[in-house]
Amino acid sequence: MQELRAVVSRRQFLPSAELFGDLATLKDGELTKTGKEIKAILLATNNGQSTEGYSAPAFDSPECLEDECCTWKYIADELYGLMHDAASNTCNDFARASIRMGFHDAAAWNKASSWGGADGSLLLSDELTRPENIAMARAGTKMKGIYAKYLARGISAADLLQLGAKLGVLACPGGPRIRMFVGRPDDATPAPRGLLPPANFTADQIIDLFAEKTVSPGGIVALIGAHTASRNHSSAGGPAPPQDRTPGKWDTEYFDEHLRPIASDGVFRFPSDVSLARSPRTGPTFQQFSGQKGAWDEVSVN
């Protein structure tokens, strides 16, 4: 009964409002084991978190060459070391940029697109020179170095960016350990323009934009909660202000912050985020996640 209640609770805020591609057209019996697992996660009948461990053999050993997970384990360990500040036990700018890069690579897509999405084009084309991506250029250069280092092992930039986003979350204390699936093909064609939300969009504009990406209003709030670790690097001069008071940690302070009448000292709130927090269509979900990290984690990993 407790498990059933958890599934029902997750379904209230399903990030994906609909399935598409093979997940929508193929019957369960026609899907691969991995396809079934991904479908179950998207439908909130399976958990997107995992505590399963993996002990990798030596990098140059025949065993590692035969096991695709082995190469990714070495990449993951290297990335995590670049994202987590052990001295302060916080995540750093590379972690938060990696989260954003994963989102920008995947979200430049909608149901009408014939290309785009999580295809690695953020690294493989000139997308990092676009205004909405320019603040990530330095982090992108670092990620390109990782890609070049392991390219001979057959990795894709598309998978690397999504792994980087998940590890960026994990590098922030409190971040959930999100399951990772590899196998995304690369496409160097620049992503379609105009499919990422500007910071001055209203809640209704954001909801309409994400509906075309199959993301529900509740899913938008779960997704935008990643701003708990973000900083506004578009600000002119001085340190980049955070979007809540604890940018080095993965907590629900972001939701608390945006339910307050005015911003806390030193905090910058994007107009779009404030609009979402005030909207009758998304504001109740801000309230649901405020102080309820477990509830937010359950939804955000799906």
What are these regions (language model features)?
Residues 1-302:
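Catalytic cores of secreted/periplasmic or lumenal enzymes
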